[in-house]
Amino acid sequence: MMNPVLWLQMTNMISYQGLVRTFLNKNDLKAFIAFPSSLYPDDPNWIPPLFIERNEHLSAKNPGTDHIIWQAWVAKKAGQIVGRITAQIDTLHRERYGKDTGHFGMIDAIDDPQVFAALFGAAEAWLKSQGASKISGPFSLNINQESGLLIEGFDTPPCAMMPHGKPWYAAHIEQLGYHKGIDLLAWWMQRTDLTFSPALKKLMDQVRKKVTIRCINRQRFAEEMQILREIFNSGWQHNWGFVPFTEHEFATMGDQLKYLVPDDMIYIAEIDSAPCAFIVGLPNINEAIADLNGSLFPFGWAKLLWRLKVSGVRTARVPLMGVRDEYQFSRIGPVIALLLIEALRDPFARRKIDALEMSWILETNTGMNNMLERIGAEPYKRYRLYEKQI
């Protein structure tokens, strides 16, 4: 397998209808990462990602690159970058679904159909050279990272590790022959609006007698993260586009969560001492970095640490949640999920976290979507995954 870093070192320029379409050069990486901010000067909901985090995400430090090879392009007009895109092959996806599918991601561009055509033309041509006959996305870089194109909910800022976008993206992508694969939903709830009906409370009290809900054990953090991985892979294995998390990916994620998430915001549910479900409540880092313009220097580090550890943030996101497969369609499976959500209420109150995003949830997951609606949440953002035969 070719090292992704080597792909970044390739350079080539192709003229396309007055544009210059360029393979991403290693020296262009900074401009590639910074480009989206040029599209949002008047958008109060745009939050520039931290450059250091995006740089690591697009490097061999991202454990996803153990099984992903990828290429990236920028489109230039009059010497200025006007768009960007990636294309990638995920070997774990191919092992599970066959070798005919590749993916695209990190699509951002000005409101110009020629720019979109140039970028997607480059991505599709490269994927064809890798044996793909089908393309889906956007993924940055796979389904376990940032996924989906924002199509509803432009009027609010994204939570941590969720994408933003421009309203014109969908129309230009669909004009190129892409069609809906599936939608992902983000649900929003105020902590004080979290309510359980008498019927739900009765069910929860019955199941509570059989289930132990505990905080993660920080003394065994690495081992606990692998328990979470096993539960996630078990519970999500039948979902659309599922690709399993690797041990390396979850270990790296654990190294990050260890410093960002308090112990009492990661819960594991057990039945007869056997872990069966979990939930992770992540303080909304985007709230803490909104005014840092993507930089932690010279004083960004101090501001970020103060906001996360001292003053706190007022919103959070549940980026990871899972119930083992054997409980998915049982009577107690959904109730275990409710008990885990309930467990976050008190630690949120102690930290003055007022609101929570649950994301993302497949639109076809009617059980979870109905449950969230019943406890006071509302769907406030919708993201689309597209597909196309190439």
Swiss-Prot record:
What up-regulates or down-regulates this gene?
During biofilm formation.
> Could you tell me which InterPro entries the record lists for this protein?
Acyl_CoA_acyltransferase (IPR016181), BcerS-like (IPR039968)
Any single biological process term in GO: single-species biofilm formation
Q: Which Gene3D superfamilies match?
A: 3.40.630.30
What outcome is recorded for mutants in which this gene has been deleted?
A: Reduced formation of biofilm.
- Supply any other comment: May be missing up to 10 N-terminal residues compared to orthologs.
Q: What is this protein called?
A: Protein YghO
